[in-house]
Amino acid sequence: MKIVVILVLFIAASLVARAQDDSITMPELVQNAQQWAQENLDTNVLNSLSDVDERAVQQFFSELEQEYQGEYVVDIASLRDTAQSVLPLLETQDETHPYAAWLKAQMDYLDVADEIRITIPPTETGTNQPPQPIPNPSAQTERDLWFKKDSTTNAWPVSAKEYVAELKPIFSAQKVPPELVWVAEVESGFDRHALSPAGAAGLFQLMPDTAKRFGLSLWPRDQRYQPEPSAIASARYLKYLHDRFKDWRLALASYNAGEGTVQKLLERYNANSYDGIAEHLPAETQMYVPRIEAVLKLREGANLEQLSAPLS
């Protein structure tokens, strides 16, 4: 009961803050959260929670998705305390473990966003002017933050020991650098059961349409949860994205945000590189790409820019 009370208080505080920031009324915000949850979350999974817990988790996931797709990285930090309360709640039930596995892989985003909030000062404004949001860090600043954070984290995810050696040859067979198997650490923490609130699943967090596009079956067994088929599809997708954008940073940004989003930003800002659009990408993607760079450096001593292009 105690964790439920704490969780509801955190959710309420988060909702109030959001309502104040965007001039949205509390009933409207709650209704938006419920509508998003109905459209995206697997209610059969969440039904294992109490009614109070289920509503709180739905609202939290809705808020997190909204901040992930938002403009400012620092805004994600507002949900850090809530996430720390939601995670153990999801871990209490076998049925909600897939969401717990996904959320656990997200916690570093919340920590780094909070560090940005602390270290980057808000933009100064004139007298009697409303405060401006904390600006997004540059792409290089993000890389530096992630390299610093990951330099203190040497232990492999437990499941990585089981999968890395098995899946690297699959990436090589698809003509993709085998080091990119570590995308799974960022996507799912190497937990093949991970399920995101948006519907991405498995080690490599493939959405249903993407999975089918690259040869996976979702019925009668969802192959996204099977390590080898999901690795094949992920490698094929990464190869396709690099063939399109000719750059691993842009390919990874597209893997996370969608190739249409990346293409539109390149055109809008007349850019030809990741750094040229980084500060305009969705907040999650702004952290996703440098996080993968840091993981590759930590696990393989590899530089993303120096990874070879996929072979024909």
Pin down the residues of each PLM region.
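Catalytic and binding regions of secreted/periplasmic enzymes and modules that target cell-wall glycans
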Residues: 238-267
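Second-shell loop/turn segments in exported
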Residues: 146-158, 166-170, 191-200, 216-227, ...
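A structural motif
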Residues: 205-210, 256-268, 289-305
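Short, functionally critical alpha-helical segments immediately adjacent to catalytic or ligand/cofactor-binding
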Residues: 175-193, 234, 251-256
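Glycine-rich, acidic and aromatic/proline-enriched surface loops and short helix-turn segments
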Residues: 173, 185-190, 203-216, 257-261
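Cell-wall glycan-active module
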Residues: 2-184, 272-273, 279-280, 294-295, ...
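Solvent-exposed, polar/charged alpha-helical surfaces in well-ordered, non-transmembrane soluble domains
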Residues: 165, 169, 181, 232-239, ...
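Substrate-binding/active-site groove segments that recognize
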Residues: 198-220, 231-238, 264, 289
